[in-house]
Amino acid sequence: KQPRGKYDILLSDSITDHMLGSRQLLQQLCTRLGVEPGVPRSDGRVTVDTTSCTGLCDQGPALLVNGYAVSRLSEQRIEQICQLIETATETSQWPAEFFAIEDNILRRDLLLAEETTAASPDGSALRALIDNGSDALLDTIEKSGLRGRGGAGFRTGMKWRFCKQAEADSHYVVCNADEGEPGTFKDRVLLNNYADSVFEGMTLCAGIIGAQQGYLYLRGEYRYLLDPLHARLQQRRNNGLLGQG
């Protein structure tokens, strides 16, 4: 494993960040800190490198510092970051606005429904699953015409029925939150403000297809969402909406 500095900085290398001037900011950062991209500084304090799309193209250019996202980069903000690094200021003491991530959703429409109900589902769908059974809920989902958010728009009910009918010793629910396509940030928005809906959907799916376990794949660029997601999971367990894992 390549050694990294105490401050491990990764600038987004997506085409949208390039268009917003990220390459010039990378050069400024390296020159100011006296480092070459990918090579730790001799004192071990800092490493500067690039990474794939950080999912922040709507507020780029962006970078990650020790796994935490900093958006809306400018020459001034890069200079401020360099000063904080040179004075060995812990990232917990950096200005809070550096780490502010906005969702930038102008129209929610049907994809996100009402903000209050979508962000904090009341468990009524889980009660319907328990009261009416998995077959009835699956029929409802199929009749609704609900489709996945991926480009193919595959019918959710059809996919779940295939999984339910598949012969296997165990079934699992997997939520793939890896989005690396430049300009894409839908998963970030869902996990940032609609995690309860995501977890409730996974729980419903598990009840329908007969799964006892679920997994959410979180890309490295979204590492800063991990602790809040764990907190949401624990809250759902405390509220009786999720098993103990």
Task: Show the residue positions of the predicted features.
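Feature of Fe-S/electron-transfer and energy-metabolism proteins
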Residues: K1-G245
